[in-house]
């Protein structure tokens, strides 16, 4: 995202910014987020966009998409511990936040994956803790509202393994015990993807009954922090994401939810960037519909991790530098193509369908900085441009 001091104008005329509905709004100056937000969560109800958590701590903000000149308005703080990577979705006029990771108390020695769930009511501007526990860890998962009022959730880290690993790491002084520290990290990071036991069920939460169910198993390796786009009612495209810490997949899958079950179909992989640079896959990318196509932009990976994994080196990102990607891809329902570039490498922000393109909000840059800026990736099916 551009670091701009001047106000930014998205010259898109009168159009609809569609996350889940098609609200109409006029072209306006779009305000920056009040603070940079990465690893946060976002949802929309009607014309109101909600973004927060992650690097914003317990802060939660709303923007009226029909009147963006009012700017982002501070809403009630999240009442749980500061949370990264929560799964968030809207249903029945409320916003639900599941799991995530962080310290249970400020003085806790290590983070954990939360098994809690919270609901935000815009009418009362208040949060409540739900009387339920997530069946598994859902940090890094994707949540989406369904037409029947339930919420489907894909992926998520294993709470037991994650909590134990971070507790063990936190108990070792790596300066005084470098060998023990290295052995612990090597042991955890060197496991094959299946050993991490990430959530391989399509879970479903029913707010009306406050209960959980399953739409069936994921026939592929479960992944975390994929990009996700809504293709139609009950149809979702899951793109790339991690299959274990440090290793992404270039795979994309179409999920159709019909008759109480999730039906999976593999579609084309993200394409290689060049003959000399294979596709590593990305985590934390931005995605959404742009006309008839899906755009996937940015994300982060480790160049060389795929080759290491193919050679049986399962600590695949050991010694590799993390890369924040600026690549943008377009998918026409059959094939991918490289559409262009972001202004900078970005990952772990929010993205929303917008008229003619993809609205990119917040995220993390190559310096690890949480960004505040918003811009539109405009796509006409042939050429990509940036409006800011």
Curated annotation (Swiss-Prot):
Its main location: periplasm. Pfam families: NANM. It catalyses: N-acetyl-alpha-neuraminate = N-acetyl-beta-neuraminate. Residues 1-26 form the signal peptide. It comes from the Bacteria. The active site is at 242 (proton acceptor). The keyword Isomerase applies. One of its GO terms (molecular function) is racemase and epimerase activity, acting on carbohydrates and derivatives. Its EC number is 5.1.3.24. It is found in: Periplasm. Gene3D superfamilies: Kelch-type beta propeller. It is an enzyme of class 5 (isomerase). SUPFAM superfamilies: Kelch motif (SSF117281). Keywords: Carbohydrate metabolism, Isomerase, Kelch repeat, Periplasm, Repeat, Signal. GO terms for cellular component: periplasmic space. Kelch repeats lie at residues 48-92, 94-147, 149-186, 187-232, 236-285, 307-356, 358-387. PANTHER family: KELCH-LIKE PROTEIN 32, LD33804P. Homodimer. Converts alpha-N-acetylneuranimic acid (Neu5Ac) to the beta-anomer, accelerating the equilibrium between the alpha- and beta-anomers. Probably facilitates sialidase-negative bacteria to compete successfully for limited amounts of extracellular Neu5Ac, which is likely taken up in the beta-anomer. In addition, the rapid removal of sialic acid from solution might be advantageous to the bacterium to damp down host responses. Belongs to the NanM family. This is N-acetylneuraminate epimerase. It comes from Brucella abortus (strain 2308). The lineage of its organism: Bacteria, Pseudomonadati, Pseudomonadota, Alphaproteobacteria, Hyphomicrobiales. The gene is nanM.
């Amino acid at each position: 995202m551009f670091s701009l001091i001047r106000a930014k104008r998205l010259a898109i005329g009168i159009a609809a910014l569609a996350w889940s509905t098609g609200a109409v709004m006029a072209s306006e100056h779009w305000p920056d987020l009040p603070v940079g937000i990465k690893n946060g969560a976002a949802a929309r109800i009607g014309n109101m966009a909600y973004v927060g958590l992650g690097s914003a701590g317990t802060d939660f903000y709303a923007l009226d998409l029909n009147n963006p000149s009012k700017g982002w308005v501070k809403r009630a703080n999240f009442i749980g511990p500061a949370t990264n990577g929560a799964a968030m979705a809207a249903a029945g006029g409320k916003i639900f936040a599941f799991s995530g990771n962080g310290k249970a108390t400020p003085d806790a020695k290590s983070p954990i994956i939360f098994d809690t769930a919270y609901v935000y009511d815009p009418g009362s501007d208040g949060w409540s803790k739900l009387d339920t526990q997530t069946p598994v860890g859902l940090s890094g998962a994707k949540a989406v509202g369904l037409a029947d009022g339930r919420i489907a959730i894909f992926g998520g880290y294993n709470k037991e393994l994650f909590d134990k690993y971070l507790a063990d790491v936190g108990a070792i002084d790596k300066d005084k015990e470098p060998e023990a520290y290295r052995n612990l990290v090597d042991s955890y990071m060197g496991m094959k993807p299946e050993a991490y036991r990430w959530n391989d069920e399509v879970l479903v939460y029913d707010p009306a009954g406050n209960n959980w169910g399953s739409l069936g198993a994921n026939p592929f390796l479960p992944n975390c922090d994929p990009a996700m786009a809504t293709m139609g009612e009950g149809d979702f495209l899951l793109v790339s994401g991690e299959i274990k810490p440090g290793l992404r997949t270039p795979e994309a899958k179409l999920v159709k939810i019909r008759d109480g079950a999730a039906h999976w179909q593999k579609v084309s992989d993200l394409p290689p960037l060049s003959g000399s640079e294979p596709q590593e896959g990305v985590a934390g990318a931005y995605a959404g519909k742009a006309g008839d196509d899906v755009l996937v932009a940015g994300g982060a990976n480790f160049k060389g991790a795929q080759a290491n994994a193919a050679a049986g080196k399962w600590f695949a990102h050991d010694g590799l530098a993390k890369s924040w990607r600026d690549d943008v891809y377009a998918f026409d329902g059959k094939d991918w193509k490289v559409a262009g570039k972001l202004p900078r490498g970005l990952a772990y922000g929010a993205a929303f369908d917008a008229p003619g393109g993809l609205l990119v909000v917040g995220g993390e840059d190559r310096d690890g900085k949480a960004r505040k800026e918003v811009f539109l990736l405009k796509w006409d099916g042939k050429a990509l441009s940036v409006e800011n």
